[in-house]
């Protein structure tokens, strides 16, 4: 709530309570609570993988809740429409909107679109709960195997482990750079490191390293290259900043460890065969 957010959407597989269609659960966030919506993974994936038609989708929604008010949350990547599936923004989204408009003109208002904030106002609060760690690509089998993020941080995936080790090094260096950026030169390089860190954490690099069966050396290396810039600029900021000699020495050790990890990642990318 400190950032102005009032609700969030999580994967349906992360719901630890009876499936909500007529109440909105809450999630404890520090001293306050956020409304939490759980994505209907089945219905959402039917759209994402072109397993439904606009008419089938709307007919299915019409039956939810019987005669009572109920809601369904569908969510997917925006690039699903037009990028992953050519013309899907017209063949599905546009067609679904036209069907709804036609139904409403005939006085059939059973299915309506709504913003999440409208649902928070319309439906009563449910339980305050702790969702399971999960993602939109997590299955119940993954949760049972204690693998909540199989495409991004899978147990047993050596490359994932190396990638996150490198992330830890870069985040530590960037934080140290900001903390001791007491000169104009140090502030300049600390700002560059901070600016590069956010895109450097993009999830595609881990997704393409998942081997389920996704594998793309160039996409993995693109993320590594962005993080390299974080480490480089953070190291320069620390060198020109006001840190103590001991802190600067520890930063040099951290850079050396980061270089070892980076080289290990590059060896995997150069030498290991695709799955």
Residue ranges and their predicted role:
Residues 1-21, 26-36:
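Acidic, His- and aromatic-enriched active-site or binding-groove loops in soluble protein domains
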Residues 23-34, 38-41, 52-56, 62-275:
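Active-site and substrate-binding clefts of carbohydrate-active enzymes
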